[in-house]
Every structure is written in C-alpha cells, then in structure tokens.
Amino acid sequence: YVFEDAVLYNKTEFIAYFLQRLNLTRDDIVILDRASDIGQAVLQHKGDSKVGVVIHADHYSNNMMSEQHILWNNYYEYQFSKAKYIDFFITATDIQNHMVCRQFEQYQGYRPRVYTIPVGSIDALSYPKLSRKPYAMISASRLANEKHIDWLVKAVIVAKRQVPELTFDIYGEGSEKTRLRKIIDTHRAQDYIRLLGHVKLDEIYNDYELFLSASTSEGFGLTLMEAVGSG
C-alpha cells in the first residue's frame, strides 16, 4: 500500500495506519467481529476509544474442554486472550452471555462485561397466500463448510429415488458453491436441485413444505427462526 506519507507492507500496517488517521477519542467505539490479522493493530492503535467484540458463533469446542482447560474458537482466541483490554463483548442470546461470563471466571479468573443484542427477530408469523409447492424443500445459509449443505444435497439425491416429486432449492452464497455445483452436476440433479444465490426470503419460505438444515455451528440460527415463523 503506497500513500503520499507512508509505504505499508502488509494488512496489519495498513490497519494501524488507518486507525491512526481516524484520530479516535474517548467518544468513539471500535467494534470487532473476527480479528484475524487485525486484532493486535486495533488494540495497539485504538487511542482513547473503547473496543467491543461481537461473538456471533459458537465460541468454544465442547469436546475439547475440561475443568482446567477450554479450547476457544480460533476466530475469538486472540480477543479472549486479551479480554482485559476489551471494554465489552456482545452476544446474540442471554444463554451465551451467561456462558461466556461463567467460562471466563472459571478459566481466566476474570468476569468480562457482556451485553446481549439479538441479531434478528420476527415481527409477525407469516402464512402462505396460496398452497405450498408439494414436496418442495428449501435451505438458506452461507454456503460454508460448517453448514454441510453437501450432506443435504446427497440426502436429497438418495431420497429422490423413493419420492420422485422432490425438489430442493438452495439459497445463499459462499466458498462451497463450486463444490456443491460439482456434486449436483455429477449426479445429474440439475432438474430438481437448484443453487439460487442471495434472495430476499421474507415471502419465499411460504412456498415450501420443508426447511432443511445440517449445520453443526450456529450462533443464532436466524434462517431457522424465519423458517419456523413461516410455518
């Protein structure tokens, strides 16, 4: 990165330069999500501002903990290790809020300041204006490894042999899209399994009879909540 007053050789230096130019004061708040490659620069150059960290996913490995040790989610490990320099954390649910506080006290001897701010809500239940499409199924999520959409695709391919009317529409974008497309093409399932990308889903859930999910990691499960709210 080349500027009139600086030559920066990596992302960390760029973040540090950016923060310095902001001239942050005690009236400012810096919100961190995942802190990969930027966490240290933010804490070193935040000035008098406050720093908050959003925890939007499972924050630890349930099968890698004991009374003395816990394995944090790698995306939050740096922030948690520097918790005394973080002014507050934000969780999506009260359950996770209480869990974070309890685990910090147990494993780090420190009680952080944690606020609960839900990432979404349903204002009203939604009902289909017309009949739902028979045997139509939907999934909606990031197309990421932990969502395991590939499991759903393979399951639908098998189920199609017994229920020929099945269709499966996949909404979302992500790094797994190419691999999912390959599975669909390999099994010649293009006629009944579709990748439909990002779409506003408010009125679309009502078209389907079944919502599918194989996710093994959910911070809040917003699309699950939306699907339940649509029957």
How does the language model describe each region?
Residues 29-31, 44-63:
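Active-site proximal beta-strand in glycosyltransferases
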Residues 40-41, 76-77, 81-112:
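A short, active-site helix/loop in glycosyltransferases that binds the activated sugar's phosphate group
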Residues 58-59, 95-96, 113-126:
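Short beta-strand->alpha-helix junction loop in the catalytic core
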Residues 181-198:
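Nucleotide-activated donor-binding/catalytic signature segment of Leloir-type glycosyltransferases, i.e.
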Residues 90, 129-147, 153-156:
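Conserved donor-binding/catalytic core segment of Leloir-type glycosyltransferases
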Residues 10-16, 60-81, 85:
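Nucleotide-sugar donor phosphate/pyrophosphate-binding loop at the beta->alpha transition
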Residues 216:
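Aromatic "clamp/platform" in nucleotide-sugar-dependent glycosyltransferases that forms part
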